[in-house]
């Protein structure tokens, strides 16, 4: 075994089973690529990304931990978000929440 390695059974695994999800259309209005990591509070991503931020409050990308989604300049894509779990409090990032959701 390698330190940090995760061994799983064969087959497909559903991520975030039973958690609330939503789809959101996101456009990169900037002139540079924007990359968003798996656990970043989507409400607080780079301001060059245009979408309904109020809807995204309390959600993150519904992708595997440690991965990211890249938005090229001028690109529009639909992403799936999943509700944050645990204590549902957000601290840091851009400092737009700094407490319970």
Curated annotation (Swiss-Prot):
User: Does the keyword Thylakoid feature in the UniProt annotation?
Assistant: no
> Which locations, inside or outside the cell, does it occupy?
Cytoplasm
Q: Which GO terms describe its biological process?
A: urea catabolic process
Q: Which GO terms describe its molecular function?
A: urease activity
Q: Which InterPro entries does this one have?
A: Urease_beta-like (IPR002019), Urease_betasu_sf (IPR036461), Urease_subunit (IPR050069)
Give the matching PANTHER family. Answer: UREASE
Q: What is this protein called?
A: Urease subunit beta
Annotated organism of origin: Burkholderia orbicola (strain MC0-3)
Question: What is this organism's lineage?
Answer: Bacteria, Pseudomonadati, Pseudomonadota, Betaproteobacteria, Burkholderiales
